[in-house]
Amino acid sequence: MVRDIEDEIRDEKNPRPLDEDDIALLKTYGLGPYSAPIKKVEKEIKDLAKKINDLCGIKESDTGLAPPSQWDLVSDKQMMQEEQPLQVARCTKIISPNTEDAKYVINVKQIAKFVVGLGDKVSPTDIEEGMRVGVDRNKYQIQIPLPPKIDPSVTMMTVEEKPDVTYNDVGGCKEQIEKMREVVELPMLHPEKFVKLGIDPPKGVLCYGPPGTGKTLLARAVANRTDACFIRVIGSELVQKYVGEGARMVRELFQMARSKKACIVFFDEVDAIGGARFDDGVGGDNEVQRTMLEIVNQLDGFDARGNIKVLMATNRPDTLDPALLRPGRLDRKVEFGLPDLESRTQIFKIHTRTMNCERDIRFELLARLCPNSTGADIRSVCTEAGMYAIRARRKTVTEKDFLDAVNKVIKGYQKFSATPKYMVYN
């Protein structure tokens, strides 16, 4: 007993040093299970804060710039000299092409014409006569080729976001959908079928019929279905104030379409610019006729159209110019007539697909109560039925709401309907 006490006193006076295992064990005291990830994140935050402070410069400075001792004026000046702004010019002629001594005649707008050479970064095969180029401001050497100039209003006609309309949303147009897909989708997806038969695929479609029968809706479904570039043009957009502006927009439109791998151009309300030519003695419609003639030339003129499909929609096919309607320009004419009983029933089911309706609604009965109605009229009936349910503070639409809506829209608005008049034109 006394000996053990003496050994403990001796150990306290002469403690033994800690080895590596003891030190590692002591470091783990007070640490949780997520200590290592937390330390790693704290280190990353600290490094990021240091990087931000270095980029921000001096906080006390009004400009936020680094101190003058850290400025590198020589490298900044060299960088400015290397990245000089270029001037836009047009290459009008190539002298001695395909040789080492080739020279290029450029026209700098509002300055002069120059005979220049190529820069170090440009290949001779990249430059063609008539194209826009970027030249430096000192020697006017060609530095880069530029794309053709296109009006921003023409560029904005391209549909970037695909519409959310599919072929299943177009009711009562089964035959029209098949004809449209044969012209648009089949040549793009299976061109070898036309090559084996030795025929050219149809390149244009004219959709005509009364208002509200689904012409524009089907074009939106085509834009959703295909991966080709889709350009939508409203006829009135091409009617410009100044002489030659509309024809220029048409040329730039087809020039942009030819630059794409595959393109679909949809002219909505084409009767605004495609009317038959006549002389009113005043000359007020001369500009519209020039625009129409440019479209006729682009559709099937001296230059090939390329892989461009053209869709046109109108309510008045009788007013269009015969030169616009001939085969080769518009190969197929698709009529959008009034839907029959089965088609009207299908349209009712399409428009009520997202509505909270009772299950026992007789859509065929509603379709029988809407004779000679278009798809737009049926959609208006569905919307009005929902309004009746909202007025009654109900969460579901009943069949009585649809019957009241039919009585209001189909019978009450009959005097505003222009369908009989347009049926005469079509």
Curated annotation (Swiss-Prot):
InterPro entries: 26S_Proteasome_ATPase, AAA+_ATPase, AAA_lid_3, ATPase_AAA_core, ATPase_AAA_CS, NA-bd_OB-fold, P-loop_NTPase, PRS7-like_OB. Its main location: cytoplasm. Keywords: ATP-binding, Cytoplasm, Isopeptide bond, Nucleotide-binding, Nucleus, Proteasome, Ubl conjugation. The keyword Nucleotide-binding applies. One of its GO terms (molecular function) is ATP binding. ATP binds at G209, P210, P211, G212, T213, G214, K215, T216. There is a cross-link at K400, K415 (Glycyl lysine isopeptide (Lys-Gly) (interchain with G-Cter in ubiquitin)). GO terms for cellular component: cytoplasm; nucleus; proteasome complex. Pfam families: AAA, AAA_lid_3, PRS7_OB. Component of the 19S regulatory particle (RP/PA700) base subcomplex of the 26S proteasome. The 26S proteasome is composed of a core protease (CP), known as the 20S proteasome, capped at one or both ends by the 19S regulatory particle (RP/PA700). The RP/PA700 complex is composed of at least 17 different subunits in two subcomplexes, the base and the lid, which form the portions proximal and distal to the 20S proteolytic core, respectively. Belongs to the AAA ATPase family. This is 26S proteasome regulatory subunit 7 homolog A. The gene is RPT1A.
